[in-house]
Amino acid sequence: MHGWLLLVWVQGLIQAAFLATAIGATAGTIDTKRNISAEEGGSVILQCHFSSDTAEVTQVDWKQQDQLLAIYSVDLGWHVASVFSDRVVPGPSLGLTFQSLTMNDTGEYFCTYHTYPGGIYKGRIFLKVQESSDDRNGLAQFQTAPLGGTMAAVLGLICLMVTGVTVLARKDKSIRMHSIESGLGRTEAEPQEWNLRSLSSPGSPVQTQTAPAGPCGEQAEDDYADPQEYFNVLSYRSLESFIAVSKTG
């Protein structure tokens, strides 16, 4: 009795070991790039790599969220959904090439492998669509353009103000110099004009230098005549006066 139970137990162990070996032999794995990124307007490859020693792939389904993208069948080949027929191209291998990406293409993508006798295997990929480098550069230039324009406008305004102040200062200086020169001209002209008017006026006395007259009303011809001559003339005239008086007497 105990021998029979031992035999059954050994047979069970052998069957369990054989079953475990069979399951291990048919088990497979899927490797994917869990997170990928691409630029808007560009393209990206969605790829799931299935590996197994004995299992064979019979069908592969590709979905975006819950929306079918494409199906591959060993018997029927590829079929791409009409909605994505202009942007989805089968390959390489059992993957897909997604073209003309938009920002709305960002999201989760699933690959489902149907195998025999291994069963079904699933993989997940998250795609992030980013703005293209040209758009980013254009946005950066657009953002820096107003700053550059503002700086140029400020510098232009400063230069204009400096130029205006310089012109006004020069004009004010010129006006001041002209006023000073005009004032000096009037100051110099007024005495000359007054003298000319005084000389040309009929009633104004004209000062002339005359030699002093002698005792008999005759003007001395020479202020610096000899004193002896002057005395002789006086004596002669006095003598003539005395003779005239004697004759009348």
From Swiss-Prot:
Q: In which compartments does the protein localize?
A: Cell membrane
Q: Which UniProt keywords apply?
A: Cell membrane, Disulfide bond, Glycoprotein, Immunoglobulin domain, Membrane, Signal, Transmembrane, Transmembrane helix
How does a null allele present? Deletion mice show augmented T-cell responses upon immunization demonstrating that TIGIT acts as a negative regulator of T-cell responses. In addition, tumor progression was slower in TIGIT knockout mice than in wild-type mice.
The UniProt record lists the Ig-like V-type domain at 29-127
- Segments on the Extracellular face: 29-148
Regions that span the bilayer: 149-169
Q: Which residues lie on this side of the membrane: Cytoplasmic?
A: 170-249
Indicate the secretion signal residues.
1-28
Topology of this chain in the membrane? Single-pass type I membrane protein
Which cysteines are disulphide-bonded?
48-111
The chain's coiled-coil residues are none
The record ties this protein, via SUPFAM superfamilies, to: Immunoglobulin (SSF48726)
Q: Which residues are glycosylated?
A: 104
Q: Where is the composition biased (Polar residues)?
A: 195-211
Question: Which portions of the sequence form the region Disordered?
Answer: 182-222
Annotated segments matching region Homodimerization: 35-45
Q: Tell me what this protein is called.
A: T-cell immunoreceptor with Ig and ITIM domains
Q: Which organism is it from?
A: Mus musculus
